[in-house]
Swiss-Prot record:
Residues engaged in binding substrate: 49-51, 62, 91-92, 117-119, 122, 169
Protein name: Phosphoheptose isomerase
Chief location: cytoplasm
Pathway: Carbohydrate biosynthesis; D-glycero-D-manno-heptose 7-phosphate biosynthesis; D-glycero-alpha-D-manno-heptose 7-phosphate and D-glycero-beta-D-manno-heptose 7-phosphate from sedoheptulose 7-phosphate: step 1/1
NCBIfam families recorded: gmhA (TIGR00441)
Gene name as annotated: gmhA
One Pfam family in the UniProt entry: SIS_2
Function: Catalyzes the isomerization of sedoheptulose 7-phosphate in D-glycero-D-manno-heptose 7-phosphate.
Keyword line: Carbohydrate metabolism, Cytoplasm, Isomerase, Metal-binding, Zinc
Organism: Trichlorobacter lovleyi (strain ATCC BAA-1151 / DSM 17278 / SZ) (Geobacter lovleyi)
Cofactor note: Binds 1 zinc ion per subunit.
Note: The reaction produces a racemic mixture of D-glycero-alpha-D-manno-heptose 7-phosphate and D-glycero-beta-D-manno-heptose 7-phosphate.
Source superkingdom: Bacteria
Gene3D superfamilies: Glucose-6-phosphate isomerase like protein, domain 1 (3.40.50.10490)
InterPro entries given in the database record: GmhA/DiaA (IPR035461), Phosphoheptose_Isoase (IPR004515), SIS_dom (IPR001347), SIS_dom_sf (IPR046348), SIS_GmhA/DiaA_subfam (IPR050099)
Length: 196
């Protein structure tokens, strides 16, 4: 059992070293885009299925409430939280539209819409990002594996370099926490007013 635990932790460390090498610049670019989204008065819409839905809710919670520093709340909505809306849309239009219908209702040009998918192939996430792009939003994917079909509909596809779903999920939550830190510092903290 201990050797299994050690192997899991070694795999985690190896992934994070790979992420440091491959994703530092893309995460910084994404943070800049999100900071600009909030600066111009727009909002963040976030979605995913299963564990990715939980990540979307976690991300929205940190943005609306706070991450590390006291600051004004920022507008972010997780599209996986309202069971009445999700089941109404699912019943009337089908599961594939549970997110896209919400994007149609809530998104305005300049918003940022983030789809989280470990496989990169969730049809309902892809459909929502397609709708978001047509609405003039920035489309972002937190993806895994090779980015799947969702990669093609993202202005910024951020792909965790792993084919193992638990590792991808660990990478996603690390990126989410880093983004929360950078957004807060960029708007209210040590990076505010800098040319970063």
């Amino acid at each position: 059992m201990q050797s299994f635990i050690a192997k899991q932790l070694q795999d985690h460390l190896a992934l994070f070293q790979k992420m440091e090498a491959e994703l530092t610049a893309p995460v910084a670019e994404l943070a800049e885009r999100l900071i600009e989204t909030f600066k111009i008065g727009n909002k963040l819409l976030i979605m995913g299925n299963g564990g990715s839905a939980a990540d979307a809710q976690h991300f929205a919670g940190e943005i609306v409430s706070r991450f590390r520093i006291e600051r004004p709340g920022l507008p972010a909505i997780a599209l996986s939280t309202d069971t009445s809306i999700i089941t109404a849309i699912g019943n009337d239009y089908g599961f594939e539209r549970i997110f896209s219908r919400q994007v149609e209702a809530l998104a305005v040009p300049g918003d940022a819409v983030i789809g989280i998918s470990t496989s990169g192939n969730s049809p309902n996430v892809q459909k929502a990002l397609e709708v978001a792009r047509q609405a003039g939003c920035t489309t972002i994917g937190l993806l895994g594996k090779d980015g799947g079909s969702i990669k093609a509909v993202c202005d910024i596809p951020l792909i965790i370099p792993s084919n193992d779903t638990p590792r991808v999920q660990e990478g996603h939550i690390a990126v989410i926490h880093i983004l929360c830190d950078l957004i807060e510092q960029g708007l209210f903290g040590i990076f505010a007013g800098e040319g970063r």
